[in-house]
């Protein structure tokens, strides 16, 4: 069996390992256009901020490891064409310019995503940068050495983490976002209010509800100003963090896709062509809160889907369980966890919900110290089905987001969570765990 894997970051690396573990006889050929694999882009802000000293530590695999497992790994090869009728892949060696065409029995599309680049006048100016891969991380580090004024465009996780990194390294930082709140997809207003105040207190200039209209360059062609409808900001460097779109042009009109280009897959990672599989940022996910297809480019989704490709390559063995989009964030000492829909995003997902916000100490007051936990539970009206939750504290409560994630995945109700069994030990929690208390508060509000 000949297997061709196109793209090798998180989903691709996971898929190759799973394919060879489950099908050691398979002839696996991997094409990757970059000179590295498995880069954890979520660590770029840690690298920029000096928490991670060596960017090489942000790789968890390498071509040599995959080769040792039995794969033929072709780095710096760009796939230019996929012929789904003849079942062939044509790739170009970016070092020599030579092209080659190979046949496949099974094709795995793990081509990932690429940052969205809005068509803003002046966006081609020097020092307007993207933040996705290893080479871009190194460019940001190098450019930041001389930059005093940094503008970050986009208030999602990557943008916010970069803001923190630049503040910690002494830069003057402006955050521009078209929405009126930061982290709008992940947190509701009670949480973002706290975090926005934290940013302002740290000297960050927040320009929320503002879209960039133009970038202005100086005489050397370097970005100098960022202009919005009501303001303009001086800048030595701009980082664009406005989201991602799937890299799936190679299969356009050849398999079913969402309007944004994300490849539709079934629960076994098969596309509309049963011999073509897709996983990671190039593919859709099944979003459990709304029971719909969605596009959520997260490394956690990628590694799970990649593993499933290997399990289901020749027969349908292990079904995808879907995702809640569970995520965590560390920002200026705050530990934050989120899963499922927010109250605000629920409407966009076709859900009619209520939400309860509750705050309590994570452990008894008789202990020498404790910390407040701010929580929210989002649940369907009528059914009480839990569809989302958020937590934030100076204490690390982020693993509780995983607990809420399981509650969403398993369609638990508010009543279920209110009386669920959790341990009690005064070092760690109270006789009623704070998640119990959150759900009990929700019951009181019904």
Swiss-Prot record:
**What Gene3D superfamilies does this protein map onto?**
3.30.390.30, FAD/NAD(P)-binding domain (3.50.50.60)
Cofactor(s) annotated in UniProt:
FAD
Protein keywords:
FAD, Flavoprotein, NAD, Oxidation, Oxidoreductase, Redox-active center
Question: One of this protein's Pfam families, by short name?
Answer: Pyr_redox_dim
Keyword check for Transmembrane, yes or no: no
| Cofactor binding, note field | Binds 1 FAD per subunit.
Residues that bind NAD(+) = 150-165, 177, 186, 243, 328
Q: Where are residues bearing Cysteine sulfinic acid (-SO2H) located in the sequence?
A: 42
The PTM entry states: The N-terminus is blocked.
Specify which residues bind FAD according to the UniProt entry for this protein: 7-11, 32, 42, 79, 110-113, 132, 157, 271-281, 298-300, 424
Question: Where do the catalytic residues lie?
Answer: 10 (proton acceptor), 42 (redox-active)
Q: What is its EC number?
A: 1.6.3.4
- InterPro entries from the UniProt entry: FAD-bd_OxRdtase, FAD/NAD-bd_sf, FAD/NAD-binding_dom, FAD/NAD-linked_Rdtase_dimer_sf, Pyr_nucl-diS_OxRdtase_dimer
Name the chain's protein. NADH oxidase
Origin species, per record, is: Enterococcus faecalis (strain ATCC 700802 / V583)
Taxon lineage: Bacteria, Bacillati, Bacillota, Bacilli, Lactobacillales
Gene that encodes the chain: nox
């Amino acid at each position: 069996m000949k297997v061709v894997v196109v793209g090798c970051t998180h989903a691709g690396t996971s898929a190759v390992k799973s394919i060879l573990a489950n099908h050691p006889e398979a002839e696996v050929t991997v094409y990757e256009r970059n000179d590295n694999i498995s880069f954890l882009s979520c660590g770029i802000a840690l690298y920029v901020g000096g928490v991670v000293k060596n960017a090489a530590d942000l790789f968890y695999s390498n071509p040599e490891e995959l080769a040792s497992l039995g794969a033929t790994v072709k780095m710096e090869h760009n796939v230019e064409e996929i012929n789904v009728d003849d079942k062939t892949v044509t790739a170009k060696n970016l070092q020599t310019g030579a092209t080659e065409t190979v046949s496949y029995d099974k094709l795995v599309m793990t081509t990932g995503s690429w940052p969205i680049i809005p068509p803003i006048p002046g966006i081609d100016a020097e020092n307007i940068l993207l933040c996705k891969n290893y080479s871009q991380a190194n460019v940001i580090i190098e450019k930041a050495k001389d930059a005093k004024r940094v503008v970050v465009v986009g208030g999602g996780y990557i943008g916010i983490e970069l803001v923190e990194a630049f503040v910690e390294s002494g830069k003057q930082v402006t955050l521009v976002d078209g929405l009126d709140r930061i982290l709008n997809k992940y947190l509701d207003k009670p949480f973002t209010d706290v975090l926005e105040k934290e940013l302002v207190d740290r000297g960050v200039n927040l320009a929320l509800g503002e879209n960039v209209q133009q970038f202005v360059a100086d005489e050397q062609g370097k970005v100098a100003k960022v202009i919005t409808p009501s303001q303009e900001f001086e800048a030595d460097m701009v980082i664009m963090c406005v989201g991602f779109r799937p890299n799936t042009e190679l299969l356009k009109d050849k398999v079913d896709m969402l309007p944004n280009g994300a490849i539709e897959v079934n629960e076994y990672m098969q596309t509309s062509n049963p011999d073509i599989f897709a996983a990671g940022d190039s593919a859709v996910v099944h979003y459990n809160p709304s029971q719909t297809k969605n596009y959520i480019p997260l490394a956690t989704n990628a590694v799970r889907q990649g593993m499933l490709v290997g399990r289901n390559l020749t027969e349908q063995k292990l079904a995808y369980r879907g995702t809640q989009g569970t995520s965590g964030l560390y920002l200026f000492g705050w530990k934050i966890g989120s899963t499922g829909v927010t109250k605000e995003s629920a409407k966009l997902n076709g859900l009619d919900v209520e939400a309860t916000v509750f705050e309590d100490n994570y452990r008894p007051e008789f202990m020498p110290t404790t910390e407040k936990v701010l929580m929210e539970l989002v649940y369907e009206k009528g059914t009480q089905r839990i569809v989302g939750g958020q937590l934030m504290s100076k204490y690390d409560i982020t693993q509780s987001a995983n607990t809420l994630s399981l509650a969403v995945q398993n369609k638990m109700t508010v009543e279920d969570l209110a009386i669920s069994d959790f341990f009690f030990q005064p070092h760690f929690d109270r006789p009623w765990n704070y998640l119990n208390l959150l759900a009990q508060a929700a019951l009181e509000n019904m």
